[in-house]
Amino acid sequence: MRFGLPSKLELTPPFRIGIRTQLTALVSIVALGSLIILAVTTGVYFTSNYKNLRSDRLYIAAQLKSSQIDQTLNYLYYQAYYLASRDALQSSLTSYVAGNKSADNWVDSLSVIQKFLSSSNLFYVAKVYDSSFNAVLNATNNGTGDLIPEDVLDSLFPLSTDTPLPSSLETIGILTDPVLNSTDYLMSMSLPIFANPSIILTDSRVYGYITIIMSAEGLKSVFNDTTALEHSTIAIISAVYNSQGKASGYHFVFPPYGSRSDLPQKVFSIKNDTFISSAFRNGKGGSLKQTNILSTRNTALGYSPCSFNLVNWVAIVSQPESVFLSPATKLAKIITGTVIAIGVFVILLTLPLAHWAVQPIVRLQKATELITEGRGLRPSTPRTISRASSFKRGFSSGFAVPSSLLQFNTAEAGSTTSVSGHGGSGHGSGAAFSANSSMKSAINLGNEKMSPPEEENKIPNNHTDAKISMDGSLNHDLLGPHSLRHNDTDRSSNRSHILTTSANLTEARLPDYRRLFSDELSDLTETFNTMTDALDQHYALLEERVRARTKQLEAAKIEAEAANEAKTVFIANISHELRTPLNGILGMTAISMEETDVNKIRNSLKLIFRSGELLLHILTELLTFSKNVLQRTKLEKRDFCITDVALQIKSIFGKVAKDQRVRLSISLFPNLIRTMVLWGDSNRIIQIVMNLVSNALKFTPVDGTVDVRMKLLGEYDKELSEKKQYKEVYIKKGTEVTENLETTDKYDLPTLSNHRKSVDLESSATSLGSNRDTSTIQEEITKRNTVANESIYKKVNDREKASNDDVSSIVSTTTSSYDNAIFNSQFNKAPGSDDEEGGNLGRPIENPKTWVISIEVEDTGPGIDPSLQESVFHPFVQGDQTLSRQYGGTGLGLSICRQLANMMHGTMKLESKVGVGSKFTFTLPLNQTKEISFADMEFPFEDEFNPESRKNRRVKFSVAKSIKSRQSTSSVATPATNRSSLTNDVLPEVRSKGKHETKDVGNPNMGREEKNDNGGLEQLQEKNIKPSICLTGAEVNEQNSLSSKHRSRHEGLGSVNLDRPFLQSTGTATSSRNIPTVKDDDKNETSVKILVVEDNHVNQEVIKRMLNLEGIENIELACDGQEAFDKVKELTSKGENYNMIFMDVQMPKVDGLLSTKMIRRDLGYTSPIVALTAFADDSNIKECLESGMNGFLSKPIKRPKLKTILTEFCAAYQGKKNNK
């Protein structure tokens, strides 16, 4: 093994990296990681503090700036208030109101105002108004007042305009915002003048108003003062009120530094949830670390509203983000530079230290290479001494050596070994150490782990200092360092009595340097030197190892034989499943090649298409299983509601169960589960439930029940489940949902037993049609369900209408609906999600939880034997593995379900009792991310999924009988136990369209009405009688539809009755039925009469048409071996006999092998019986011939082979052929 860098770079793992490089990288990563963690923590902490401190500083600066503004305005206000409260003005206004309108009345007032204006350069113009806002007195400062333009005066005298005035004018006054006059800013302050001329009245009232135009330069100087505000920008904004008196906008009082001078004239809107809105409307101050509201770039700012009553201003102090973050940026640069410098220093220091530290390991590596190359262990002294010494050391170290090996070495005491030079080889009888190949094999075997049987064969010893490890090497973890050093000292001092080595072994040994400290590396060196001596004893273990390996090979052989047997069973089953649709495809193709009638060819193509779809379904199951086995299936998690799963199951299987006359109930418990938005792969969950429900419907007889219960069990205990490796789904204690779902039925619901409720979908549908007080949530659910149903069944109905076919496509409801279910679950929204605006499903919750959801599917089918309840989850295993099994399939459904459940950390369990039914429980944990509110709905859970709902009452209606009502309630297929009578299963779509009366197929007049291809068929069509053909597992998936459309005899197919409208496997029928004999009464009695025993409808049609092409028209069909026995018995009692019987091997009830034995033994039937089977294996052929069959016809059936069989075994066919 080389530790250095390779000469060529290896691009595939494991990558070769020297231990020196690894040590350097490890130390560097630890040092740099620690520095980075410290640097990041420090940087984040101080950066956050810097930001907080600097934002607080901006806020304090804004407060100071607003205080300065308040002081300036208050100074101007009190001077103006002083003028407004002068007695001269009050007396003049009182006299004016009393009727004295002469000029003499205003002389004193004018003098007072003139003195006030001339006393300061701050005031320019003063104008007095009466209470009706009429100007009665105007005075100006001769120095500046006459120089103000008219447009500026108009904006500064708000009382002279028609602009609405604020109500504060009547109490404290108003202040206009500064207006630019050339280079200076002016503003005006309007105050009310209160007077009380009466000595009787105590309250003063407003007799007039005074408006004073004053300079705003003092305010401007406060605005421009940026003392102690480095790189800061100051802004003052003023609120703009609308006609309702609300602050709807703002503008700048003064243009900020660097902006245009006309910026104060622009009004900006106030957005909600901004600091401007909070400051204007709530009077709150504060700071922002990052915003771009007042600038195009990011800035940090502090703001504080002014407290002056006449204005609504906000002072703002802002800084660019680069200035605001400059201290934090500087600190980050310092920390980064320091980390990089320290990292470089650590790396440079680590390189020489790592070189020095790995030198002992390098020496150990070189010594190992010498031993690996086969050099060393060449004894130069007589082998007797060396071997004895070696064994002595072995015993002292705890080794036990077989006595045979000791005897062998003693016997060789007289032999000697010669050493010649560095590469000399030793010669001795039986010395295995001299062969390089033996050395390499010994080392290689030593590196392998010993199997468990070797532990039992471990050689006992009485020494506890050292033991032989499981891989054959010394376990020196148990050796003390003193004993090792003692051995080494003894080895150096007594070389004549211990194992001596050649020059190569001397090179292999590691030198023992004098050390200051003893560590693991020194122990490793001593252990390595001891290991070279332990190689002798290693060979003693080889025999035991070979014996243990032999036992392993024997066990592996048994396991391989079991696997081979399982493979044979799988090949037999899958061969039957695949060959059955292939028989339909190839057989009908061969028939179509011989046909010239377009209708017959089209009908054959339909059977080919349905067989191809069934074959595709089987292959899809196999591929899905293979994908799960290879762990390439990935969960696609998303938000969904458990109601989505219930709706999908209802929309897919509701009609299926109704047509099958099986009561399907779906319930959700408790109602809290409906409000949860869960996170998981809803498509895979729907797939699992669909497989379980499909299985339940397949095995449930007519008038049976299938219950689907979705429960909330409690909170998920992830730690305990993970500890148990997710073998079970555990619930936290105290969170269990203890309320019993099976409570007393207060609505008189139909029950399956005394303690179990059932939600009958058929009665639910009736209730939906009769109850008009449906709540809002039910309307939404119904709407979604309608959309899902339309999307699922639209294709099937369209295909039926376009093809004018009585039988729907063989694509199963579960297969075709699954794709639609995925689509609907992704694009349809759950009720109550408030998702019309494009928002997310539901609303988030503060504390997301993980819940345990249980989905139970219980049926009243035949049940599963306890011995098979665990094996049914294995791939390709079914509850009934015999040839006479009633239900087919690949046996992958439950295996796929368990695989998907394990992927979700869930479980799949089965409880079943033979003769009672089965219950599959799928339990999994799901995270709740959101919740749905139903607060606005009066009855949010009033639907068919609630057992307590009024919609689950069974309501019966008395409807007048009519043709349509008779057709809508036409009889369905009878159970398998009654094969003497046949009825028609009609889909609701077809029933509503039918206009003719349907008669029983079992009418004894049928045989007389079917005369020939023309006349007999016309009579059959006139009376609208539909002959029924046996339904097999290949057709069980088809919809139960007998349309009122008429099929001609040339199409070769009548209307088909189906027990089960979902997909089963091929080649298995669910019930036995009377098959109308297809025969021609005009034929003479010497015509060939053949019985075809086949449970698959497609195979029946293939062989029947092939026989028709051979000129054989007198053909009878049977569905299973029991019916074949009855037909042969009935015909034998009349003194007649079939010329030949074609017998399928795998059939329900009674398989072909047992039926053949019964016919031969009990009825004495001697005519030929030819086997029909899809498993064309030599062992199967031999088994058929031993049962009493004469020939073998494999599927897919080929016409030349069929013709050969007829020629070989049917004498009547040969005679008929010769007559022609």
Curated annotation (Swiss-Prot):
Catalytic activity, EC:
2.7.13.3
Sorted alphabetically, which Gene3D superfamilies does this protein's record hold? 1.10.287.130, 3.40.50.2300, Histidine kinase-like ATPase, C-terminal domain
Q: Which residues cross the membrane?
A: 23-46, 334-354
Superkingdom in the source lineage: Eukaryota
PTM characteristics: The phosphorelay mechanism involves the sequential transfer of a phosphate group from His-576 (H1) in the histidine kinase domain (transmitter domain) to Asp-1144 (D1) of the response regulatory domain (receiver domain). This transfer probably occurs between two SLN1 molecules, rather than intramolecularly. The phosphate group is further transferred to 'His-64' (H2) of YPD1 and finally to 'Asp-554' (D2) of SSK1 or 'Asp-427' (D2) of SKN7.
**Compositionally biased region (Polar residues):** 965-984, 1063-1075
Segments in the Cytoplasmic topological domain: 1-22, 355-1220
Broad class of enzyme this protein falls into: transferase
BP term (GO), one? phosphorelay signal transduction system
Phosphoserine (modified residue): where?
S502, S758, S833, S1041, S1044
One Pfam family it belongs to: Response_reg
Keyword RNA-binding tagged: no
Localization per Swiss-Prot or TrEMBL:
Cell membrane
Residues annotated as carrying 4-aspartylphosphate in the record are D1144
How this chain sits in the membrane, per its record, is: Multi-pass membrane protein
Q: From the UniProt entry, list the residue stretches annotated as the region Disordered.
A: 414-433, 444-500, 960-1016, 1040-1081
Decide whether keyword Ubl conjugation is in the record: no
Which cellular components does GO assign to this protein?
Answer: cell periphery; plasma membrane
Q: Which PANTHER family match?
A: OSMOSENSING HISTIDINE PROTEIN KINASE SLN1 (PTHR43047:SF72), TWO-COMPONENT HISTIDINE PROTEIN KINASE (PTHR43047)
Q: How does it assemble?
A: Interacts with DJP1, MOG1 and YPD1.
- According to UniProt, the name of this protein is Osmosensing histidine protein kinase SLN1
Species = Saccharomyces cerevisiae (strain ATCC 204508 / S288c)
Quote the gene name from the UniProt entry: SLN1
